[in-house]
Amino acid sequence: MFLDELISEFDRGLRSMTGVSRMSRPLPVPQESAVTEAAPELSPAERAHSAGLMRVNHVGEVCAQALYQAQKLATRSPSLRAVFNHAAIEEEDHLAWTAKRLEALDSRPSLLNPLWYTGALAIGLAAGRMGDRVSLGFMAETERQVEQHLDSHLEQLPEADRESRAIVEQMRVDEVEHGKAAMEAGGIELPFPVRGLMRAVSKVMTRTAYYI
């Protein structure tokens, strides 16, 4: 059984790194009520900026897959495995959505995805080794920081890029729920230095992924 699970997670990891992700939910689209007229064409600068932001979001989902796969494998609790697995499935939707949007913007995922994935996998295993409550706290803090990034992206994305905005808005809804579920399952608040280190690492990743 563990071997089957390991093979399944390995397959998911390969899909994460190669950009071949499965969608369990359809691609979010702008609400009809928000679309009163045809959106103007994005300028080359707006298209490039949207692509950079969506590439950052795609990298975040690559990392989320690795984190939750590692944490799922590290815990012995069936109920916590279910928590991590549910989050991973929805994050795989995010991965597929952002990949689709990058393609529509005539752009590409980060060239460093294997590096991001490997690093996040190691961090997830380390968090899992510290115990379930710490691991859940790490999940909650990760989602909290992702939520802040998405808020920032909603402020930065061009108003005309309704498609990207619809994706980011749904991602934000999901991330809030994942963080809430982690705390309700027994997660603890991480110490301030740990949260600060996570922000510093995230800043390096986002700045790099925007371009590469």
Curated annotation (Swiss-Prot):
GO CC terms in record: plasma membrane
Residues noted as binding Fe cation 1 in the record, renumbered to the chain: E61, E91, H94, E175
Disordered: region residues: 21-42
Alphabetical list of InterPro entries matching this protein: COQ7_proteobact, Ferritin-like, Ferritin-like_SF, Ubq_synth_Coq7
Residues the record lists as binding Fe cation 2: E91, E143, E175, H178
Superkingdom field: Bacteria
Co-factor binding comment: Binds 2 iron ions per subunit.
Principal location listed in the UniProt entry: membrane
Keywords of this entry: Cell membrane, Iron, Membrane, Metal-binding, Monooxygenase, Oxidoreductase, Ubiquinone biosynthesis
Cofactor(s) essential for the protein: Fe cation
One Gene Ontology term from the biological process aspect of the record: ubiquinone biosynthetic process
Subcellular location: Cell membrane
Catalysed reactions listed for this entry: a 5-methoxy-2-methyl-3-(all-trans-polyprenyl)benzene-1,4-diol + AH2 + O2 = a 3-demethylubiquinol + A + H2O
EC numbers, comma separated: 1.14.99.60
Pathway field: Cofactor biosynthesis; ubiquinone biosynthesis
Topology term for the membrane: Peripheral membrane protein
GO molecular function: 3-demethoxyubiquinol 3-hydroxylase activity; metal ion binding
HAMAP family with a match to the protein in the record: COQ7
Role this protein plays: Catalyzes the hydroxylation of 2-nonaprenyl-3-methyl-6-methoxy-1,4-benzoquinol during ubiquinone biosynthesis.
Family: Belongs to the COQ7 family.
Name of the protein described by the UniProt record: 3-demethoxyubiquinol 3-hydroxylase
Organism: Paraburkholderia xenovorans (strain LB400)
Phylogenetic placement of the source organism: Bacteria, Pseudomonadati, Pseudomonadota, Betaproteobacteria, Burkholderiales
